Amino acid sequence: MTDQKNDSATIQTTELLQTSEAWNGTPYTAYPAGKPQLTVMKMTIPPHTSLPWHSHPMPNMAYLLSGQLTIEDKESGRTHQVKAGEALNEATGDIHRGYTTDEAAELVIFYAGAEGQPLSEPLPGEPAEF
């Protein structure tokens, strides 16, 4: 067994994001009904790439590991930029997409859904996000 120190004074934490609403102001109203299922996904979006228009049926957050990502709300046209080291509180139910410019974006996404529930739902006529 390795010798371990139990010294909480040396542990560092930083709260990246705590919220009850998405980046665009839409409140999170409830978690999905059903047996809870947490999903963590890593996504890499190449430079000059746009994700298809889509929505999420459950609360989710992302952490940008590298690059920059712009999120665009379809209805309002409003955009929000996220840079490496920042967290994103994604919209639930609102149609949106993400896109990159000159550099790739690498992010980790955390979904709080229910068993059997899709993580992403494409706008009719759009391809699946993943």
Give the location of each predicted region.
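A short, N-terminal "cap"/entry segment at the start of jelly-roll beta-barrel domains
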Residues: 1-39, 123-130
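A beta-strand edge to alpha-helix "cap/lid" segment located at domain peripheries
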Residues: 5-7, 72, 83, 120
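Ligand-binding loop in jelly-roll beta-barrel domains
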Residues: 83, 92-118
